[in-house]
Amino acid sequence: MSFYRSWIGGRGDLVQRYTSSIRDDAEIAEEVVKVMKAHVTHLAEIGALRKEVADKIVAALEEVDPTELLRGEFEDIHEALEKWLIDKLGEDVGGWVGLARSRNDHVAAAIRLAALKKVGALREAAMRLRCALAARALEYADCPMPSFTHFQPAQVVTFGHYLLAVDELVAEFLHVLAAAEDLAKRSPLGAGPAGGVRTPVDRRRLAELAGFKDVVENTLYASGGRFFALALASAVTSFLVELSRAVDDFIRWNNPLLGYVEAPPEHVSTSSIMPHKRNLVTLEVLRARSEEAVGHYAALSGVVAKVGLGYSLDLQEATRHLWDILNIAIEGVEVLADFVEKIKFNCEKGRRDAELYYATSSDTAEERALRGVPFRKAYFELASEIREGKARLLTVDEALKRPVLGSANPEEVRKSASRRLALCRPKSF
């Protein structure tokens, strides 16, 4: 029987297993202990707890192995930790940790801190990806290929230009992620179950002790609100959705019918019956898991949407989807960074296809217009020439000399890639 419900009675193993979050709480185990240390330390600071009692509790918290707390039959890790402290120190010492706290504000704090740790890991992986993209873009600045619209050969670009497009996505994501991260840096501690606590805690000092930058002022919203989780999940899921488009491109280009990329051997597998196959399995998994993240976000937002602003156990079920989204992103971005660092692009094939499939036609029409022919007339004349096999098109290298910021002009690609590489530490790529 769980510790808190022992006074109610009615032990039920089925119900205990069904409602307990103890297995999922592995994601926040260290943060729960950290939050408890801050709580006890502050109670001693304001004189609500004798220093010698607080010292014993903090010393015990320094010793506890958070993973051990996950092995018992408890509702959650908060209950397990309090029971462990009481068993170790006695009720006259351990029994004080329940003062001026609720599982509601403490779990909200632990989730925020654990999420921030994962966001840090994701940011590091994203920066590794950015550095890889910039380095390879510089290497392939002059390597032509057709771009694709409607999955048809379109305007000629370079592989370096394509990689910088992916990098710009990652840069935008990091900007959005930072805004969502700021929400998670606000502390709910001291909010209690909903309306605050009678013990005169200094919530700003408590936030400082726990490692937060600010506080969520309204106590009801602090303990029951989950907008920070929705914001993080939304930012990361949106990024994965957009990133999966590039992942899909790489998978297509690995097909020998296109043959634009040679995937690193460690990223491919073969068939059990067709030994010629080189299946880009890492990116296939990343593509699938990006779609899974969409499902997790739908589940997270769906659960939160049906719960009043105060805490309900529904929110316990929502949190696991946040961890799934963040874990999918961290692992996936690390895999993609490794892929980009090692990929080889077939510049000869890219140039040949750009020439074969008229990827310089728009530049040719535009060039004629700049020489005095109305653009639509130049367009139709060129269309007729292409249909008749008589078109005199700009060469690939001529077409790439577009004088606009951010274009596929190799000089523009080199400047942009060099500027972005300057943000990278040498060990990052």
Swiss-Prot record:
Q: Which cysteines are joined by disulfide bonds?
A: none
The primary site where this protein sits is cytoplasm
Q: Which reaction does it catalyse?
A: 2-(N(omega)-L-arginino)succinate = fumarate + L-arginine
- Specify the superkingdom: Archaea
GO molecular-function term, one example from the UniProt record: argininosuccinate lyase activity
Q: Which E.C. number(s) belong to this protein?
A: 4.3.2.1
User: Where is it found, in Gene Ontology cellular component terms?
Assistant: cytosol
Enzyme class comes to: lyase
* Pfam families documented for this protein: Lyase_1 (PF00206)
Report the subcellular localization. Answer: Cytoplasm
Q: Name the pathway it acts in.
A: Amino-acid biosynthesis; L-arginine biosynthesis; L-arginine from L-ornithine and carbamoyl phosphate: step 3/3
What is the organism of origin for this protein?
Answer: Pyrobaculum arsenaticum (strain DSM 13514 / JCM 11321 / PZ6)
Record keywords: Amino-acid biosynthesis, Arginine biosynthesis, Cytoplasm, Lyase
Q: What is this protein called?
A: Argininosuccinate lyase
**GO terms for biological process, alphabetical:** arginine biosynthetic process via ornithine; L-arginine biosynthetic process
Q: Which InterPro entries match?
A: Argininosuccinate_lyase (IPR009049), Fumarase/histidase_N (IPR024083), Fumarate_lyase_fam (IPR000362), Fumarate_lyase_N (IPR022761), L-Aspartase-like (IPR008948)
> Lineage from the top down?
Archaea, Thermoproteota, Thermoprotei, Thermoproteales, Thermoproteaceae
Mark the transmembrane ranges: none
